[in-house]
Amino acid sequence: MKIFTKKWFRSRLNSAIKSAGRRYTPQANVTLPINRLFNWLARTEEFYKELFNLGESFQKEWEESSLKKNYAELNIPSRIMNKLENEMAILIKFVATCQQPTFNAIDFNYPLKIIKKADKKIVWLHKFLREKERKLIEGADKEKQAYPTPKDKVNNFLKDVIDIREILNELRSTCGSNYAKITNDRSVLLLGEAGIGKTHLLCDFTEKQIKNNIPAIIVLGQQLQTIDDPLQSIVTELRLTLSSKAFLRRLNAIAKVRNQRILIVVDAINEGDRKGWRQGFQKFLSTLKKYPGIAIALSCRTPFDKVTVPVRSKIVKTYHRGFASHELDALKIYTAIYKLPLPEIPILSPEFSNPLFLKLFCESLEGATIKKKHAQIHAISSGQKGMTNILEDIVIKKGEKIAKSFGFVPKFVWQLIKDDFASSIADKGNGWILLSEAQQILNKHIKNSVKANKFLKALISESLLAEDIVYEHSSKTPKEVVRFTYQKFSDHIIARHLLIKKFDKNDPKSSFTLLDKLGWLFKDEHAIYNNAGLIEAIMIEFPNRINNKGEMFDFLPVKVNGQLAEMFINGLYWRDSKSFNEFTSGWVSGILKQGNYRNQILDILVALATKPKHPFNAARLDNYLKKFKMSDRDLHWSEYLRYQDETSAALKIVDWIERFSGDISEEYALNYVSILKWFLTSTRRMLRDRSTRALYYLGKWYPSLLFNETLSSLEINDRYVSERMFASAYGVVMALHFEGKNDFNKKILEPFARKIFLGIFSKTAKYGTTHILMRDYARYIIEIALLHNNSFLKDADKVLLQPPYKNGGIRSWGEVKESEEDKKNHKSGSAPMHMDFENYTVGRLVDHRNNYDYKNQEYQKVLANIFWRIYKLGYSHEIFKDIDSQISEYNWNSKEQVKTDRYGKKYCWIAFYEVAGHRQDNGKLPERYGQRIPDTDIDPSFPNPPKSEEIVKVNFLNNSDLPIADWIKTGPIPDMKPYLKLNKLSSHKGSWIMIDGYVSQDNLINNRSMFA
């Protein structure tokens, strides 16, 4: 075969994939952020596209800003603006230059210096404009001002300043990233634990390059067992009769002709000649540096990088985190591949971030009947089966396959692991045994030493055991050892062994005291720290050992410190549901009262709450949260929600429902609705909005569940909850009544509407309110029900349904003015009501008031009503001031489009809507609003954003052989006529007339683009 052809590159990839075996599963592709790294390393089209988009956004943000165009209107010093404009022009030119395909290094340090200078001016401008804003407010004329007012102009400039700072930060982040270093160094070392997906990632990227007709080479480290010169060993493995220098010259020449870097990948260098790699590593990299058309990606399993890569090597290291933050995508893909039912809850154990673990989990169920698969998944989802049982199942199933292939009885491997290996590792007390000791264990059972050796290799290759290296004491020479592949399983199986051998259930206290029993684990803080995983595993197993008559904490000779509390919390998710008892509840309650670990344990409780049959299910969480005063709940629960990110149980639950609401059964939906309801207390707008929409999704499938929970939310002392529950219910009613199903309209909607009327609008209503949004949602639900049966309410009751209302909610409003002393005590950002809300939002409730007219008596009364109400709700500046200052500061520095509200603002919004309803009832709202004020918070119809249809499939840039000048001159001009009128669009019949659309195509490698 001719070398360095597309066919040759493909054959080398196929050979590597075959050798990789089960480590590469092409159909199990999960899109991960780390893919971006390889685009930068190889300078693919995606790399140039990313820089193009960044440059376009940067230039647009600056060129279209009021700050650039009209800075003189606010007397901003021209010396500041001239310097800033010059710096921005330099940065725009820099990004434009980066978009030109090149092999050369890009000087990312230069723009970082310019950004630093520009940022100082942006910070100065922000202070300058804030001061101008303050002076305008103090000197505001109560007479009507033309729009835009001076204050409006300042606000527009401030918004521009914030937006420009964000785009500067984005450019700074890009230029200062490891990716920038990698694209210039043309080399990267990918590190990660066993099974994390390094081989899959590298094979997949190489596959993508070759599919795109870009040369790339991958070699597996296991093929390089004897290395004198790493580069020459690679050439030899590729079966080439070339010197390493000739090999690199040929590849570099191809890269130059194509104007495209060629990537050489060596996967798992730890599986080859580690000493050879270590000795030849620096020479290998320095040789490659001479060939600008070539980039290199190496991977190594941790901790073997310590003995394979020189300590002083300056190669950029990056860590593969597996499916972290993408577990839900992975779970959906893998369950489909292995034909398993999708669990009805997100499995929140971090072990599922490991691709190999997820694969082994799926394989352990693969051979079961459909009925058994469903039963197993249901047992895990419902809480009947703990995570430790899952680990055992994986090991048992995998062990049976290995045993069968060697002619042993099915349980041979399981007995070997839980008895022999667990015993030896437990006796060692450090989580491992020497490789030679592992061989001795097998030699006892397998008399043929060759067969015993093969059997050990099988246990390692099938991931039941893992090879590792350790350094003992001051020794500089590592020892080869064997440990269990998964730390959780290792801890669990050793803990079980210790509890059998060293624990006396008739005298638990002495078992934890005596050093020759289990006391050595607790003899001091150092011992506790070093054995954290093992202690956690013993905690998980302990209740079952004493017939659920206590927790390990009840028998310990030492005080329960933070370390032990954290182990207890971490173990809760892993436990069998039957091991939860009254003592568990007591310790959970105790930890919840301590602030240090509250967020951590609440996240575990949220995860457990998804499991219907678990003792700590959603009903229990519901009962717990109902008992709080609103302000206490905000400090305790809403603060937990504020700190949660995409890896938390809370966000994963929302994500799960957004993706899979149609696959969730009624039993689980009931739990989800209850949990989501409590997410609505949050001041994080993103979480609150997504949770409301998730409730709507579930409600469309199970309207009765949502409606019942909506009615029960009226009992909750936080209107943030019931307002959004009614919003989601109203959305469901709008969606389902339109379908015209009598079962829904008669059997579900009508009874719901009747209960709403009795609870909110009747003369004896217990939950009447002036909250204008919630009241409107409730009224519109009833009015839709009346469309289908106008007689289910009496005429007299229909009158009570229409505004203005005489009853319900607060009818006698107090007034409290914020004292001057309180105002002085406000830290930056800590006031409950900031200027925009105070002037614009509250001002909208008062007719004939001009902006900044703070002396308007009716306006002053409304403000006093709102302050009176927020204090009645439990707001206190003293308890929320530090948190609200922190939120204000975070919002200023955050890139998030949807911000987090301060708690003061939350209480102000509730009071605002209640005052608005009261003023509506008394005819005091501005007439221009009609029956609906502009501050409607969320669209209760929950529309899906319109999809962009891609109708042009023709590649107008396919003639890449012509020089650019000829291509521009000779065309051809793209023909758009066929797309102006279509007989069919997607699956929808036409005719369809094009009103608006565009065609944008780029080929950045060949420096061509078109837009029509």
Q: Where are the language model's segments positioned?
A:
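Charged, amphipathic alpha-helical interface modules that flank catalytic cores or transmembrane segments
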Residues: 1-193, 200-208, 212
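Extended hydrophobic
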Residues: 1-82, 86, 207, 306-308, ...
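P-loop NTPase signaling cores
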Residues: 118-424, 440-454
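Extended amphipathic alpha-helical scaffold segments
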Residues: 201-220, 660-718, 724-727
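Alpha-helical solenoid scaffolds in eukaryotic proteins
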Residues: 283, 516-520, 537, 586, ...
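Leucine-rich, amphipathic alpha-helical/linker segments
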Residues: 355, 499-567
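Long internal repeat-built scaffold domains in very large eukaryotic proteins
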Residues: 562-669, 732-1012
